[in-house]
Swiss-Prot record:
Keywords: Mitochondrion, One-carbon metabolism, Pyridoxal phosphate, Transferase, Transit peptide. This is Serine hydroxymethyltransferase, mitochondrial. NCBIfam families: PRK00011.1. The gene is SHM1. One of its GO terms (biological process) is glycine biosynthetic process from serine.
Amino acid sequence: MLSSTLRRSVRAQSKNLPAFARRTYAVSPSAQALISKSVQDVDPEMADILNQERTRQKNSITLIPSENFTSKAVMDLLGSEMQNKYSEGYPGERYYGGNEIIDKAEALCQKRALEAFGLDPSQWGVNVQPLSGAPANLYAYSAILEVGDRIMGLDLPHGGHLSHGYQTKTTKISYISKYFQTMPYRLNEETGIIDYDTLEKNAQLFRPKVIVAGASAYSRVIDYKRMRQLSIRLGAYLLSDMAHISGLVSAVVTDSPFPYSDIVTTTTHKSLRGPRGAMIFFRKGIRKVTTKGKEIPYELERKINFLVFPGHQGGPHNHTISALAVALKQCTEPEYVKYQQEVVSNAKHFADALVSKGFKLVSDGTDTHLILVDLRSRNIDGARVEAVLERANIAANKNTVPGDVSALFPSGLRVGTPAMTTRGFGPEEFDKVAEFIDQAVNIAIELKAQEQGKVPKELLASFKKLADESDKVKQLDKEVVSWVSKYPVPGEL
C-alpha cells in the first residue's frame, strides 16, 4: 500500500495536470463494464435464448437443404472487430477514411471467390457485398433490365424461388413480378424434370430479356448448355442462381453454370458452408460480335457494382465479407472437396433409403444435395409431417410439388444432406433418418384421423395440438435426441 506521505505527493502532482490526464480510464468503470462484459453478464435473458438455440441445434437432425453448420473460423470473423468499420464504396474508392485494412479484406474475398470456382479474373468479376440471395437477384436484374422488361424463371410450385418472379393468377407474390413482367417455365409432371421443349416454345413467344436457371427445390442437374443456346437465339441474358449448389460447384461434384452464363448469383451459407451473405459473378470482355464484325462488350461490372452500391445498399457488412473470405479459402482444401462428394453420395443413398420405405420422390431421385418427397401416395401432406418431425427434433420443410393446389397443405417434404454430413453422417446414419421419417409419417396419418375443425387453419391447429400431446411423438423425440446428440457440431471438438 502507498504510504500517506506518498499519496499526498501523488495528489499534489495530479492537481497540476489537465483534467484528461488525471483520469485513469477514458470511460467510467460502469461504462467500461457495459461494453466489455460477456453477453451472459450483460443480458442473461438473451444469453439463455442463445444457449437454447445451441442445444436445439445439437439435439436436432437438420435436414433443411438450405441450412448448414459453418466453421468455427468463420464464426470467429463474424463476431470480430471487422464489424465496427463503415465502408461505403469499393476497395480504393471509399466514402470514408480508415478503410485500408477493410480494402485488403474485401479484395482478398473477391480473389478467393474467383479461385474457389476456377474463374479467370480477366473474364469474370465478382461483387461480394450483397446482404443475401434475394436482394442479389434484384440487383442483377436491375443492372440489365428496365422496369417492365421480361424474365422467365422456374415456377415456385415446380421448384423455383420467390426471387425469380413468382405470381399467382390473382396476386403478384414476389415484388420482382411487379417490377418486371414474369413468366414461369415448369417441370414435366410425369418425369419431374424441367420441360425444356415447352420452355423453348414459350420463350420464343414471350421473348424474355433474362432467363433464370436455378432452383430451390429441384434435385436434378440443370441443362445449362441448352438454356445458353436458347438465350443466344433470343438475345437474352442467362442468369444462373446457384444458391443451393454453389458448394457442389466449387468442389466440381456437379455441373457448373459458369461456362454458359452471363451472370451467376449465389448465397454463401447453404452448401457453400459460409456466413449468411451473397455474391454476384459477372462476365467481362466481349458479349457478342454483330454480323458486320462489330464487337459488343459486356458492361456488367460497372452496372452491377452501381446497382449494389449506391443503387440499393449503403455500407457493406465487413464482418460477413471477411468471414466469407475464410469460407472461400476452405473451399480449396482437399477435405472440403471430400465433404461435398459425401454430401452428394449421402443424398443418393438417402433417396434410395426413402424409396425402400415406400416413398415416392419427385424425379425419382437426386443428382445433388436435396430430395423432394411426394407424400400423396401416403395420403398425407408436408405440413402435417413437418409438424410431427419438428416436435421430434427433426428439421425438414413442407414444399409444393408439381400439381399442388394448396399452399397450406402442400404435398411435398424437402430434405437434404449438407448439415448432417458436416456433423459426420454417412450412409448408415441416413438409413436411420429414413426410418425416423417413416415413423413420423405413420404417426401423422394416425393423428390426421383424429383432428377436428371445419376450415384448413382449424384442422392444422387441431393436428398440432394432437402432435404436442402424442406419446408416440414424445417417444420419437426421445430416440432422436439420445442418438443425434452424440454427433459433434463445429467447434465442439
